[in-house]
Amino acid sequence: MVLADGDVTSEQGLAGYHGSVDGHYYAVAVYSEGANGIVAFDEPWKNVCATVYHELEEVRTDPDVEEAIRTGEDSYLGWYSPQGGEIGDIPISESGGDLGSVMVEVELADGSGSVPVQLMWSNRDSAPASS
């Protein structure tokens, strides 16, 4: 199955999305390897983890965006900037699409390793941040 959204597909450029149906919220990520989805890391599972991180952050901060799109009613929007979009989209846009600058590995708090994430927009810092 190939998912399409405008000029991107799950085979090229579309890494994931989130939405809702009748008050049930979901996030979807594609397996990102080669031309599939996005490639920010050298291991496909890391691309998937960073994509899931992006989508889960957005489903938390802007859960009803699909309702806003369906109805044209902005009151459904949560954390959303008319100039840049959702909390995970702004860093990608600000980087000029350079995924390597916003999808990074961060150290775990207990020092046992690192985990791939996408930096989210921070209003406090006016820049992408990991927390």
Give the positions of each predicted feature.
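N-terminal pro-sequences and low-complexity stem/linker regions of secreted or lumenal proteins
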Residues: M1-S131
